A protein has these predicted regions:
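Active-site and donor-binding regions of nucleotide-sugar-utilizing enzymes
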Residues: 4-174, 178
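Single conserved hydrophobic/aromatic residue that forms the stacking wall/gate
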Residues: 177-186
Length: 186
């Protein structure tokens, strides 16, 4: 039997953190699985075979994207080429919608199984992205409680799993712990 191959794409530091935790969790369920993709040091330490480091995708704002577009486009094309070569059982896209939603369109046309983990905040802006999620993704996973209901009203089945970092803080922080005033300042 072939080892399960999973291709994961994160484009920023927060995605690298969540991706590393995801890889660790998936390895517990399937220790022989192989992980390939775009990530950072955390994902690589968790077992990801890097095809590109996120530091090469880190751009903020439209002007930075325009300035670095040739590099981003080259990475995009390389990603598609690597996915075609590796033929993963599943592709997991983590947040980073500007890149990952375009990638979802390309990969769906090639019949890949696509999971989107940490959904674009289409409820805040660019609601038009819902169509791409609906048409191109096989599974949608949310970390924000209200998204399951919100997306259901739009006709999408979303799995809510809770926030991956919630286990890092199991106590409530009070104003006194932060030494903040409990009465209005102004």
């Amino acid at each position: 039997m072939n080892r399960e191959k999973i291709f994961i794409i994160a484009g920023e530091d927060s995605g690298d953190l969540h991706g590393a935790k995801l890889i660790e969790s998936l390895k517990k369920k399937n220790p022989s699985a192989e992980f390939f993709g775009i990530g950072g040091n955390r994902m690589q330490s968790a077992g990801l075979i890097l095809i590109e480091h996120i530091k090469n995708l880190n751009v903020i704002g439209i002007f930075e994207v325009i300035k670095h577009y040739p590099r981003i486009k080259k990475i995009f094309n390389k990603t598609i080429k690597e996915i075609k070569k590796i033929r993963p059982h599943k592709v997991i896209l983590i947040d980073y919608p500007g890149f990952n939603l375009r990638l979802a369109k390309e990969l769906k046309a090639l019949n890949f199984n696509i999971t989107y983990f940490i959904l674009p905040q289409v409820w805040a802006w660019k609601e038009s992205r819902i169509k791409v999620l609906k048409d191109c993704c096989n599974k949608l996973i949310s970390i924000i409680p209200f998204e399951k209901t919100w997306f259901a009203k739009k006709g999408l089945d979303v799995h809510y799993i809770g926030h991956p970092l919630s286990s890092l803080s199991n106590q409530t922080v009070s104003y006194t712990h932060l030494t903040l005033p409990t009465t209005p300042v102004v």
